[in-house]
Amino acid sequence: MTMKEGEAPFVGDIVLEGSRIARIGPQLGEEADEVIHAEGMLAMPGLVNAHQHSPMSLLRGFSDDLKLMDWLNRKMLPAEARMTPEDVYWGAKLAMSEMIRSGTTAFADMYIHMNEIALAVQEAGMRASLTRGLVFLENDGGRRMREALDLAEKWHGGAEGRITVMIGPHAPYTCPPEPLREAIGLAERLKLPIHVHLAETKEEVAVLREKYGRTPTEYLHETGLFERVHVLLAHAVHLSERDIGLLAGMRGGIAHNPVSNLKLGCGIAPVSSMTGQGLVVGLGTDGAGSATTLDLFEEIKAAAWLQKLGREDPTALPALEALRMVTIGGAELLGIADKVGTLEPGKQADLLLVDLNKPHLRPVHSLESLLAYSANGADVDTTIVAGKVLMRNRRLLTLDEDEILRQASVRAARLVAGL
Ligand SMILES: CSC[C@H]1O[C@@H](n2cnc3c(O)ncnc32)[C@H](O)[C@@H]1O
Ligand SMILES: [Zn+2]
């Protein structure tokens, strides 16, 4: 399944040369140095997680069933204040083990100690867009901006081009006008995209109304942001029709995080209205500290079901559209759609083999329905990024999973002790 617009699934071969797809088509039957026989399997583009906080895998299940602000202020921020660069490194590796196992090949990450995440990405062999999250409520904003700049200088284009960097003002409610303008200015100067949370809860909308007399979207729009740079907006749950109009024509788009939104009771993002206005939508998990899973197959289902339920219309967000969101949609949000997101000659070989030899994946009336509504991450047999096999026959080849699990248990226990 190439995910190229209008191209039907076919039985065939994919020939890789180096990091790229050289040829793809029905039964090419070419000689090769190495052959993966994939009878009964389906090849598709790697999944793109368009928004998350990878080291929060260490906080999975530590604090559930709370409102967003209580969860963040009372639980996550105190645990994060204890995180060392080494904790972040091992938390990111834990997340990457889960992502590779469930077919994610690229992800957009916003967090702290980003140098350690970059090292982990380099070693794991994944593709990532990395962002130093910028919260400006305390007075060390200058140090954070310097860290964002250092990250860009050291890692943009790094790991053989698999790493790119964005500038990350965290959210309208944590970024007053002056530092927000500085962050946007930095992005413009470095020609980098912006990655920012937007309008996740009704409370956020009320806070912005009280502080600035504007919706969160109006607040960002007023800076000229959407005309100036490529923007990755995470969540965008509470947007009015007018807000959606303000985003029309933007470069970048929206990372929809349906499982996180469901679990935190945030609301249903107006995804169908956004796509109706021509906005690009991708899918993200958010951190495992809120969503508890990094399996994008869960997000595909949740995204489709939420739109169908919210609009009381089973035709809303059909299977193929959800699959396009999690592949080429995410690639567009990360600014790498020229490299990945579809299977076609010349693009990077970022792809998965999904094992269809399972009772819950038979019979094959519709591959797109099976993938969107019946498959899960454990059905992924093989994950390949830039032509390198990261998982084969469900065995991780670039990560030491036993060591990662050991490090994660010890470090997670220390982070949450007494909180
Ligand atoms: C400063 S790094 C990023 C920062 O974001 C926090 N975070 C995680 N999930 C969410 C969410 O759903 N909304 C807002 N902020 C979130 C994370 O804990 C880090 O502190
Ligand atoms: Zn987030």
Please state what every model-predicted region is:
Residues 58-90, 97, 124-138, 201-230, ...:
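Active-site gating loops and adjacent loop-to-helix segments of metal-dependent hydrolytic enzymes
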Residues 60-126, 147-158, 409-413, 417:
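Alpha-helical scaffold segments that flank or form the walls of functional sites
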